């Protein structure tokens, strides 16, 4: 069967402007959250990615009228019906688990296929389940392919998360907004996307305090009305283009950013020696090698984002010494390492830390094992001498809007082929 590949002839200098899109990690939670509304909802600034399309079609399976026009989604839930959600859609998309919290909040029950998405090693949803149980839900996990969750009624509870989890924080919020009484989530995730989802729910009439801190308080309400919401800019997409600009850019401007959201990355790029000028909602970056070696450790927000650990790695081959990247969130998130070795990189990974030495990359055939590994291989391909062919590009399209045409507009020699 023919599949699409991305091909890159490296070594070009890129210049121009990039308009950053809405945050994938917000969008994939806000679309399911629209189920909780009892009237029409408009969501603007959505990224044009396959994950959004999959979620919109899942809403259709619940008899919700949807209209997706570019970056704007209109949702009319007036004739919503509860229905089991099929595996074939759910298994392609990790964030489909937000349908659990949203359907539990709306109907007090749901049957849903088990979530898929990027294979990053163990990412259990035990904290989500712990939260649902605390609110009064019973969970039937007897099937290997789906999960049944139901509650006679949902009652507010104090929930302490054993690990800081964006997914669990948001999912518990979704289930709790219409529960009876107060829910308190302790050790909550503080990511900007958590705040964005809380702001969306508040615009529907939810009573949520403390989003963006480690303690979130939710007072349940009986009804949620319609609203209009603009998704925040994507700090990971912006960060990926910042890494690309630092690798091979000459005066690249990235528009539609929130500087504080990308600060953990800009601090590291400046430590490398990258020339960055940050404005109110944009950044101008140019390559300024040779770079200094740096150590990077991924942490929950406001630390260095795990989703940018892979895209920044190719920059470290341009440093004048040994760099170390330690992954504390998903210690198995090093599937890009073998692919980079195929390109001639001097890199190894052991016990959650990658050791990266100065290297000259050459084009090769490589496989994108997950979304951000794919982004890493694009940065590497732009730096490499010769042609790089990236397979399994469906992962890349899950998180980056029109990345090939965007890079082309900056002067990259990049194209797609059917093979």
UniProtKB/Swiss-Prot annotation:
One record GO biological process: cell division
Keywords of this entry: Cell cycle, Cell division, Cell shape, Cell wall biogenesis/degradation, Cytoplasm, Peptidoglycan synthesis, Pyruvate, Transferase
Record EC number: 2.5.1.7
PTM sites of type 2-(S-cysteinyl)pyruvic acid O-phosphothioketal: 118
CDD domains from the UniProt entry: UdpNAET (cd01555)
Pathway membership, UniProt: Cell wall biogenesis; peptidoglycan biosynthesis
Binding site for UDP-N-acetyl-alpha-D-glucosamine: 94, 123-127, 307, 329
TM helices/strands, residue ranges: none
InterPro entries with a match to the protein in the record: Enolpyruvate_Tfrase_dom, Enolpyruvate_Tfrase_sf, MurA_subfamily, RNA3'P_cycl/enolpyr_Trfase_a/b, UDP_GlcNAc_COvinyl_MurA
Catalytic activity: phosphoenolpyruvate + UDP-N-acetyl-alpha-D-glucosamine = UDP-N-acetyl-3-O-(1-carboxyvinyl)-alpha-D-glucosamine + phosphate
GO molecular function list: UDP-N-acetylglucosamine 1-carboxyvinyltransferase activity
Top-tier EC class: transferase
Catalytic residues, chain numbering: 118 (proton donor)
Localization: Cytoplasm
Pfam families documented for this protein: EPSP_synthase (PF00275)
Organism domain of life: Bacteria
GO cellular component assignments: cytoplasm
Annotated family: Belongs to the EPSP synthase family. MurA subfamily.
Function: Cell wall formation. Adds enolpyruvyl to UDP-N-acetylglucosamine.
UniProt cross-references to PANTHER family, sorted A to Z: UDP-N-ACETYLGLUCOSAMINE 1-CARBOXYVINYLTRANSFERASE, UDP-N-ACETYLGLUCOSAMINE 1-CARBOXYVINYLTRANSFERASE 2
Protein name: UDP-N-acetylglucosamine 1-carboxyvinyltransferase 1
Organism: Staphylococcus saprophyticus subsp. saprophyticus (strain ATCC 15305 / DSM 20229 / NCIMB 8711 / NCTC 7292 / S-41)
